[in-house]
Amino acid sequence: MKKEMQERYILGIDQGGTKTAAAVMRGDGFIVGQALARGAYFPNEGMESAAAAMQEAVEGALKSAAVDCEDIELTVAGIGGVDWPGDDAAVKGALQERLSLGEIFVCNDAVIAFYSGTLRSHGAVICAGTGMNGALIDREGRQFVYGDYMEEKAQGGSALARRAARKVFDAELGLCPPTKLTQLFLGQAEVPDVDTLLKRYMTEDAFRKELRFLVPQILMVAESGDAVACGLIVEFAEEIADYIEAGFRKMKMNPEEEEVVLAGSVFKGMENPLTKQVVKRMGERFAGAKVMQVHYEPVVGACIMGLIRLQMEPSEREKAIRESASVLGLCYG
């Protein structure tokens, strides 16, 4: 029986604009191969380009694991851009055309991020990097992905940076107190005053986009006690908590019985002021809700989701998952 379990293989795929990752997990929880390829976002680049990147990553992972496509019992693919009915079927078809894989399950990449933070089958995840997305999975396996229900002002690091810039302009106008954010943004723009900063902000699209790289410093300003930056973080955390609460309500899930996973660079570190505020807001609203950060790269979450779909309890394989992910550099922290 033990040999049979070890000979069952799950293939996990994670694709976003930055990279495409693939990993092979054995039935006993050990990750035995992985590979990376270029990133792709099929709504912008086309399915052929995205599928080619997936094929490259999958073939590399299979080679690393010394297994063939025919050895894979289940493939779980978390793909950025799977937002609308039919997108999953299109990705599945593109994979089947290129690779001799058996059963394939395709979902939005936010879904696999949930399983990179918990070994439970149900709960919620909020992913905040350059943008923001999230998903909920109930006890029956039904999914809800926020997608475009999350408005522009909530779009992760990009939105937080734009809102911080607005606080600088508000401070200059006298709508809020002076803030250390002003010097941060003047330094980034390499300009002497807020008037010149405002001109760059309003007329240079590339400059507005590069402001997202200031997110770590914005969080540091808040951590230093700057009242304006702290207020901004509290507002942002409150809105994130609103989305989480609304999602639970929509899915008719009891938040006090669920786990909420925070994923993405904007939430990095439990001492991160934004992370602390989200944890605080959720604790105030739902006494039993447990908020945690991701433990693994999303591709590991795809494999863990595969275990659950094959009714192979992940918690019984936790040690193997953790140790093999650590060896392969797939762990956070």
Regions found by a protein language model. Name each.
Residues M1-E70, A94-E97, G117-H122, R166-G333:
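ATP-binding/phosphotransfer module of carbohydrate and carboxylate kinases, centering on a glycine-rich
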Residues E73:
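Cell-envelope/extracellular polymer assembly enzymes that use nucleotide-activated donors
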Residues V82-Q183, L328-Y332:
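Phosphate-binding/catalytic loop of phosphoryl-transfer enzymes
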